[in-house]
């Protein structure tokens, strides 16, 4: 087996780019939302900051989970067939 060069490594799933790693993106987004929540909750003191940070983390987790949920799209009923033969088209 031969060793891959840098160009081939970059083509394989974003190797070599730590900012494109999905896990680091999730951690960065959670930390960012926790910081924003803590900043908005700062008027409530330490307790408000904790509640704000928890709300920011919860928002990130729920939005990430909602993105992976199946989409329920109803299929419209289209009349098929002629109505003169009783097919209710």
Swiss-Prot record:
<dbReference type="GO" id="GO:0031640">
    <property type="term" value="P:killing of cells of another organism"/>
</dbReference>
<keyword id="KW-0078">Bacteriocin</keyword>
<keyword id="KW-0964">Secreted</keyword>
<dbReference type="GO" id="GO:0042742">
    <property type="term" value="P:defense response to bacterium"/>
</dbReference>
<keyword id="KW-0843">Virulence</keyword>
<dbReference type="GO" id="GO:0005576">
    <property type="term" value="C:extracellular region"/>
</dbReference>
<feature type="signal peptide">
    <location>
        <begin position="1"/>
        <end position="15"/>
    </location>
</feature>
<keyword id="KW-0732">Signal</keyword>
<comment type="similarity">
    <text>Belongs to the class IIa microcin family.</text>
</comment>
<keyword id="KW-0044">Antibiotic</keyword>
<protein>
    <recommendedName>
        <fullName>Microcin N</fullName>
    </recommendedName>
</protein>
<keyword id="KW-0929">Antimicrobial</keyword>
<keyword id="KW-0614">Plasmid</keyword>
<comment type="function">
    <text>Active against E.coli and Salmonella, but not Listeria or Campylobacter. Channel-forming microcin. Probably neutralized by its immunity protein McnI.</text>
</comment>
